[in-house]
């Protein structure tokens, strides 16, 4: 929609009149309004503002959401309502009224034009609303309609008349006509009234500049003729007064002729009454109106003195306003008529009123400058026409100086004046034109001087408690005095001597000289202790040196012939002031000054350091002649000592710092001394205890004497960088500032290149972090520095790397690497020695630093600029680092200490480096486009690397091993990018290399190709030939032969190239090899551990090819494996994993072999138990080494252990006993295996033990081994949060132990469970578990684990799978186990949990636990309990002949169990209600229907049932069984009554009256009826008399 929407014809003339603002205006006709807004429009007629605002919101919403233009009837109705709604007292109603108008304008577009005359008045008036939100809403309408300057101009011309008409109507309204006094408070009535008047006046003021003189004169005159208007100056509303004054001023400025007829009213309101009225908030506007009226009509002031008329207003000051009041007042006073006879006579009173106002408590202090300026201007005007009398000056000017110099209560009405005001005041004094005034001024200054001198003389002694305060006050007064003197003398001629009293400056100078003499005399008399006098002298020498230049005052202050005076000066508080005096005269009197300096320094140095430091600091802080300072050897030594103290780590005193700064800024120390200091500081940076942590000394030297460090900026720069890295953030920021300063002064790139070179060549704890070097190297590289300038030396890198390649590789690497047994072949070079490696503080060695740095640089450059030798070193470093990481080598390229946090951090860094290396390798491979076709001309980067690495893989050294490993990585990268090479060219190249043979020179190279290309060489003839030769050569080898090991290693790697059972060798040859292997195992002592491991691998890999071959070697192989497992118990942890893992894999492959031969099956069966025992004994091996190899071994071993048959575990009790101990193993895998076995075996073992316990009537208890585990409660305090999140093994062992305890509960009967519970209760074991549980899960801190957020379902709560738990994080595993254990605790030990809960003191824990229980556990346990009841009810044993089945009904919705026992077609029934907090809250048993027993007996059954449930660990089924037993017991022996043929009588009782003759039992009630009917007291059966009934029965009582 286009804004405005009005035609080009603009705003025409309209005949419609404005709507009434009165509340009694007739309501609009709503009959034509649409139905959807008729109700809101009716609500607008109501009085309540809330109702109105809601109605407006509803109408607004309807207009906005409607797709159709608004109906004309709505616009018409709104035009009638808008004027009154727009002035409502509620700001929200007013704002919404304008918002609604805007939406109507948008919707109606041009159709609104005819209604605008009715709307324009309240709309424009709304733009002047005091509330900003309301005004903003009204202005939004203006912005929409008047969206161009042309439209604005037309609008104001077209609607001037309507706006004037609206204003005239508004000004004639009254508070009673605008509001209904019956329903509106007086305050609200006045607020609306003033709001209407204020906006109408503001609108008129806005219109006045646009109305031409001949336009609407009647309307404007009519507005000013309104009687109401002239009463508004006395309004209580400041905004109304302000609007009135602004309107009058606007009339005077724009239409003065219209106002002239009302001049009498104007004079009355503005001049006569205005100053007398309260003008807070409107005073400035009143003054502006007075200025306007005075300019146009000065006669308005009448004959009375204007000062007298203004005095009431002036006396009140700005009344909380700004300094504009005084500015406007000054302008008004400047144009006031002064012709009245009493003008001068009223001046003193007027000035007094001004002073009172200026210094009143209500006057803002920031107004003082403008106020005093106005005051002085006023005095100047008053005195301009005549010479003021001395009395006038004494009363109205002189006190200003007195108050400024020495504030007192007597002159408090002159406070807050500043020197410019004092100067101006004295300029008003006609000193040279009037003798009386001159005499008065001289007397005033002499009095001021005498008073000040007396104050100095009478200053308090040092012993006085107010000594400091009084001295400072006098010092400040002296400073103010000579500030004034400085101002007085500044404008005088330079040659003027200021002698005599010819002019005012001379009088001031003469007085000041006397004052200085008094101050000097006071110092001499009182041993220089009154430092206020010294301060006065300093003020004179620094601010008015012309007064001191030609006097001998300075010589009196420093008497050269009085050494004692100098001793007194240096120890006095006057020293800083006097030193400043000396500094001021030094340029004019150098010889005298030098003599004084020497004496002062000698006196100061006699006090030594640090006592003399404050004295020397003062002396060197003023311009001290260099010759004096640098010639004094004692002073030089003193300042050097100060610098050394300043540089110390312990904070120096501020005085020492100030002394050092002064010594630099004033060149007190010679360059030679500073050079020595700088060199010493540069060396000590970074040395603990020798450097200032604030670096103030270094910063000071660098900023002022940077040339001092020119010989060693690199060393200093490096030291600072190192400090920056290891310091806290605050200190690091300071170091960075110093470092940046050096970098800026000496050139960044040049410094950094040298720093990088030196930092890469060395490594120590102070070395720069490698990431810092990388970051800055990249910045330098981007600035255009060649890459070669930034790279490390390949020779140095190679040398440093070789020192790590002299160690034999860790044997366990044969487990983790595809190189397998190749690690057994690498032997330490002859003559090599282990050296302590240099490392940085992150444990990185020099080659590690170089590798990280270079790899990061190479990631951002083209491969064409990369050097092949550095690439080769990166890949060699990477394969070595990968192996170090695999075995967690403590002293490898990175130091990997035992600390878990440090090890994890450094492991992550190694992995990041390896990832970068892999990416770089992929780039190298990708750049070798000719590889796929086999076109290998040796020119590509990859081929150059292959040739270089092949040249190094020519022996059995560790370097050859890692060169071949790097070669393997390169081959794999090439295959990954390009696939396997094919074609004759590649075969020719491959064959030409001649490496597929088993010689010491070719073994590693062959392994590199076999592992690098893997199955890609399966079709190679050269590989097949090598395989056949190796199989043949094995047959002729002996264990002790040097070539045996590398032949077997190479054979095993060849076997890995081919799929199982598809090797290119005859089975016969493989059988011979198998025989040879089993022959070697007959002499185990001749075999090295490496050969042992490789033999097991060989048999394992040959096995699929010879599975159908019969022979003794199967049993021999198994026996050898068992032998190895036993041998491992006495071997080193570095060696035994290498052969144990392949032996386990060999046994596992035998067990899982498809269609094995009978010999193998027989061997496996015969050794089954031995293997089970041996496997479990392997679990007991120590876990001193934790690395990837050991983890692989543990996982493999645990998988094998899990397959142990249950019968082996139950039949061999020793095995189970050993497993309990393994639950506390340091290996998670071993713990898992032990738990898995115990989890399976424990229920079976417990079943047998429980049977024995019940038969032999022993007390059952939890196994002692389990009790010892759950009694070893872990101390959580020794773990950090991060360590605890890693689920420490001792915490895991403890929790798994508890899981096994509950496993024992699971299969045990009630009696045994109770005995278990008693044993746990005795040692308080469960409490410790619960405390640990809720500490870990967050309940103790009030932040319980959110099971929903952590995706723990009901299934997780009910069950725990140890193997599945290891798939997530360790922290989640711990949380899951704890969550499940709490469930088991509630299920099996609710009584103990409840006891712990009731004793719990922590309210926070209790609250967290309550909500947790109610949300997650209670519903599950209630469901379990109801399921258990259902199962019990459905599995009840068939009742005996005289018994009935207990009928049980479960109501899950009500959480209730009902049980009934049928007796004579009725049911004795109870209800068991389960609370929401079950099982921590007890169930409630209610007796629903009593049958067969009296109330007392019945209640005892109900209580007994509840007691059984409560004390049977919450078992509802036990309670039901007890209830059934009680009923059956009560009915036992009771037969039907022979009279009624029922067991239970009508009064719900059993037969209890026996005939002594026939022994039959009868109901009492039945006998009674029988007696009544038969009229006999005889037995119904035997007819013999029964005399057993009591009197009550005979009376028909029938009760007990």
Swiss-Prot record:
A zinc finger (RING-type) spans 1537-1583. Pathway: Protein modification; protein ubiquitination. The lineage of its organism: Eukaryota, Fungi, Dikarya, Ascomycota, Pezizomycotina. This is E3 ubiquitin-protein ligase listerin. Its main location: nucleus. Keywords: Cytoplasm, Metal-binding, Nucleus, Repeat, Transferase, Ubl conjugation pathway, Zinc, Zinc-finger. One of its GO terms (cellular component) is RQC complex. It holds the Pfam family TPR_26. The keyword Lipid metabolism does not apply. The VLRF1 domain mediates binding to the 60S ribosomal subunit. CDD domains: RING-CH-C4HC3_LTN1 (cd16491). Belongs to the LTN1 family.
């Amino acid at each position: 929609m286009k804004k405005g929407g009005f035609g080009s014809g603009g705003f025409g003339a309209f005949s419609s009149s404005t709507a009434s603002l009165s509340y009694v205006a007739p309501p609009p006709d709503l009959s034509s309004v649409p139905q959807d807004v008729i109700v809101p429009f009716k609500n607008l007629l109501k009085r309540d503002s809330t109702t109105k605002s809601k109605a407006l919101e509803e109408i607004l919403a309807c207009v906005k959401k409607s797709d159709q233009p608004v109906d004309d009837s709505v616009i018409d109705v709104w035009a009638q309502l808008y004027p009154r709604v727009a002035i409502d007292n509620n700001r929200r109603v007013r704002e919404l009224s304008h918002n609604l108008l805007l939406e109507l304008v948008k919707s109606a577009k041009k159709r609104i034009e005819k209604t605008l005359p009715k709307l324009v008045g309240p709309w424009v008036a709304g733009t002047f609303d005091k509330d900003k939100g309301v005004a903003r809403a009204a202005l939004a309408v203006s912005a929409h309609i008047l969206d161009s300057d042309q439209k604005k101009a037309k609008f104001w011309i077209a609607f001037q008349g309507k706006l004037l008409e609206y204003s005239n109507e508004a000004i004639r309204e009254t508070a009673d006509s605008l509001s209904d006094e019956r329903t509106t408070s007086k305050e609200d009535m006045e607020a609306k009234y003033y709001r209407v008047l204020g906006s109408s006046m503001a609108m008129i003021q806005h219109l006045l500049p646009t109305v031409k003189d001949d336009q609407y004169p009647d309307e404007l005159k009519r507005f000013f003729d309104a009687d109401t208007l002239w009463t508004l100056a006395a309004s209580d509303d400041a905004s109304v007064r302000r609007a009135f004054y602004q309107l009058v001023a606007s009339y005077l400025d724009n239409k003065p002729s219209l106002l002239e007829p009302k001049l009498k009213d104007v004079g009355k309101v503005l001049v006569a009454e205005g100053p007398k009225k309260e003008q807070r908030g409107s005073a400035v506007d009143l003054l502006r109106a007075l200025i306007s009226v005075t300019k146009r009509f000065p006669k308005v002031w009448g004959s009375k003195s204007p000062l007298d008329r203004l005095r009431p207003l002036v006396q009140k000051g700005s009344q909380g306003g700004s300094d504009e009041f005084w500015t406007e007042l000054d302008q008004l006073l400047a144009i006031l008529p002064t012709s009245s006879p009493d003008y001068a006579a009223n001046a003193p009173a007027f000035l007094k009123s001004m002073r009172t106002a200026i210094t009143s408590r209500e006057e803002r202090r920031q107004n003082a400058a403008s106020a005093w300026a106005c005051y002085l201007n006023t005095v100047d005007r008053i005195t301009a026409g005549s010479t003021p009398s001395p009395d006038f000056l004494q009363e109205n000017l002189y006190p200003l100086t007195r108050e400024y110099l020495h504030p007192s209560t007597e002159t408090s009405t002159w406070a807050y004046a500043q020197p410019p005001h004092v100067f101006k005041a004295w300029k008003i004094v006609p000193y040279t034109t009037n003798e009386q005034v001159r005499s008065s001024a001289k007397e005033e200054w002499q009095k001021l001087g005498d008073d000040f001198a007396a104050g100095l003389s009478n200053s308090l002694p040092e012993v006085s408690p107010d000594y400091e305060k009084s001295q400072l006050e006098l010092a400040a007064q002296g400073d103010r005095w000579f500030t004034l003197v400085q101002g007085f003398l500044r404008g005088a001629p330079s040659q003027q001597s200021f002698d005599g009293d010819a002019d005012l400056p001379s009088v001031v100078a003469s007085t000041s000289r006397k004052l200085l003499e008094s101050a000097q005399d006071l110092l001499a008399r009182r041993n220089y202790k009154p430092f206020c006098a010294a301060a006065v002298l300093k003020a004179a020498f620094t601010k008015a040196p012309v007064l001191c230049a030609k006097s001998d005052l300075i010589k009196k202050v420093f008497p050269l012939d009085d050494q004692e005076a100098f001793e007194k000066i240096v120890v006095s508080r006057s020293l800083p002031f006097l030193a400043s005096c000396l500094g001021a005269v030094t340029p004019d009197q150098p010889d005298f000054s030098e003599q004084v300096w020497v004496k002062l320094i000698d006196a100061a140095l006699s006090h030594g350091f640090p006592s003399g430091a404050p004295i020397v600091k003062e002396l060197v802080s003023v311009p001290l002649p260099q010759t004096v300072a640098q010639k004094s050897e004692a002073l030089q030594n003193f300042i050097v000592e100060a610098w050394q103290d300043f540089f110390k780590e312990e904070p120096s005193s501020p005085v020492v710092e100030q002394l050092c700064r002064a010594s630099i800024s004033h060149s007190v120390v010679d360059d030679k001394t500073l050079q020595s200091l700088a060199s010493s500081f540069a060396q000590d940076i970074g040395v603990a205890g020798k450097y200032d942590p604030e670096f103030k000394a270094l910063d000071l030297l660098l900023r002022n004497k940077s040339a001092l460090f020119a010989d060693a900026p690199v060393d200093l720069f490096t030291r600072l960088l190192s400090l920056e890295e290891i310091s806290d953030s605050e200190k690091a920021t300071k170091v960075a500032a110093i470092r940046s300063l050096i970098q800026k002064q000496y050139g960044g790139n040049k410094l950094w290149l040298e720093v990088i070179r030196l930092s890469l060549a060395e490594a120590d704890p102070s070395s720069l972090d490698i990431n810092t070097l990388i970051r800055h190297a990249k910045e330098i590289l981007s600035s255009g520095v060649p890459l070669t300038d930034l790279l490390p030396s390949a020779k140095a890198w190679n040398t440093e790397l070789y020192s790590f390649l002299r160690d034999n590789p860790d044997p366990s690497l044969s487990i983790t690497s595809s190189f397998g047994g190749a690690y057994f072949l690498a032997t330490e070079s002859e003559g090599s020695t282990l050296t302590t490696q240099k490392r940085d503080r992150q444990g990185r060695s020099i080659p590690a630093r170089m590798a990280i740095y270079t790899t990061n640089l190479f990631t951002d450059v083209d491969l064409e600029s990369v050097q092949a030798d550095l690439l080769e070193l990166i890949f060699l470093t990477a394969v070595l680092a990968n192996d170090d990481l695999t075995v967690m080598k403590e002293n490898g390229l990175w130091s990997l200490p035992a600390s878990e946090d440090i090890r994890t951090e450094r492991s992550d860094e190694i992995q990041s480096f390896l990832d970068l290396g892999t990416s770089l390798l992929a780039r190298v491979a990708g750049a070798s486009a000719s590889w796929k076709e086999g076109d290998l001309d040796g020119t590509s980067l990859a081929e150059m690397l292959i040739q270089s690495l092949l040249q190094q893989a020519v022996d059995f050294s560790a370097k050859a091993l890692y060169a071949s490993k790097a070669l393997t990585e390169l081959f794999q990268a090439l295959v990954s990018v390009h696939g396997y090479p094919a074609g004759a060219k590649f075969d020719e190249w491959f064959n030409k290399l001649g490496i597929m043979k088993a010689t010491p020179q070719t073994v590693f190279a062959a392994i590199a190709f076999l592992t690098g290309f893997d199955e890609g060489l399966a079709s190679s003839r050269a590989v097949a030939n090598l395989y056949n030769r190796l199989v043949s050569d094995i047959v002729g080898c002996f264990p002790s032969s040097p070539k045996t090991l590398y032949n077997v290693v190479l054979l095993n790697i060849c076997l890995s190239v081919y799929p199982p059972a598809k090797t290119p060798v005859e089975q016969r040859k493989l059988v011979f090899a198998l025989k040879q292997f089993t022959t070697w195992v007959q002499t185990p002592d001749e075999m090295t551990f490496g050969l042992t491991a490789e033999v097991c691998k060989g048999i394992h890999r040959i096995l699929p090819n010879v599975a159908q071959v019969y022979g003794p070697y199967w049993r021999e192989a198994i026996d050898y494996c068992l032998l190895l497992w036993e041998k491992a118990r006495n071997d080193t942890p570095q060696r035994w994993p290498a052969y144990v893992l392949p032996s386990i894999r060999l046994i596992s492959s035998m067990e899982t072999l498809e269609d094995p031969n009978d010999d193998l099956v027989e061997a496996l069966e015969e050794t089954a138990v031995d293997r089970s025992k041996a496997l479990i004994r392997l679990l007991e091996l120590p876990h001193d080494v934790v690395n990837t190899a050991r983890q692989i071994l543990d996982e493999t071993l645990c998988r094998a252990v899990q397959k142990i048959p249950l019968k082996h575990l139950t039949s061999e009790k020793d095995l189970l006993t050993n497993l309990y101990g393994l639950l506390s193993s340091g290996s998670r895998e071993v713990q898992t295996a032990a738990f898995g076995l115990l989890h399976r075996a424990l229920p079976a073992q417990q079943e047998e033990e429980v049977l024995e316990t019940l038969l032999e009537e022993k007390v059952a208890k939890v196994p002692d081994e389990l009790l010892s585990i759950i009694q070893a409660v872990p101390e959580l305090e020794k773990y950090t949060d991060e360590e605890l999140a890693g689920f420490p093994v001792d915490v895991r062992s403890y929790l798994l132990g508890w899981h096994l305890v509950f496993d024992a509960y699971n299969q045990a009967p009630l009696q045994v469970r109770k005995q278990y519970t008693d044993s746990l209760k005795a040692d308080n074991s469960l409490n410790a578990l619960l405390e640990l549980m809720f500490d870990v899960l967050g309940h103790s801190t009030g932040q319980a684990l959110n099971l929903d957020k952590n995706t723990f379902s009901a299934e997780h709560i009910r069950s725990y799978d140890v193997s599945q738990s290891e798939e997530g994080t360790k922290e989640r595993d711990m949380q899951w186990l704890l969550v499940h254990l709490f469930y088991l605790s509630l299920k099996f030990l609710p009584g103990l949990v409840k006891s712990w809960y009731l004793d719990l003191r922590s309210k926070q824990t209790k609250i967290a636990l309550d909500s947790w229980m109610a949300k997650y556990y209670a519903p599950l346990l209630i469901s379990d309990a109801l399921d258990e009841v259902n199962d019990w009810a459905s599995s009840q044993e068939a009742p005996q002949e005289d018994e009935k089945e207990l009928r049980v009904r479960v109501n899950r919705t009500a959480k209730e169990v009902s049980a009934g026992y049928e007796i004579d077609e009725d049911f004795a029934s109870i209800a068991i209600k389960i609370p929401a907090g079950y099982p921590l809250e007890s169930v409630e048993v209610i007796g629903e229907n009593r049958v067969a027993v009296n109330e007392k007996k019945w209640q005892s059954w109900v209580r007994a049932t509840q007691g059984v449930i409560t004390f049977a660990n919450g078992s509802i089924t036990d309670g039901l069984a007890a209830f059934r037993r009680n009923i059956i017991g009560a009915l036992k022996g009771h037969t039907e009554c022979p009279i009624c043929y029922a067991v239970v009588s009508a009064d719900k009782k059993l037969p209890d009256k026996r005939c002594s003759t026939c022994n039959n039992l009868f109901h009492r009630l039945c006998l009674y009826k029988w007696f009544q009917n038969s009229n006999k007291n005889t037995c119904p059966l035997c007819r013999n008399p029964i005399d057993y009934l009591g009197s009550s029965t005979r009376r028909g009582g029938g009760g007990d």
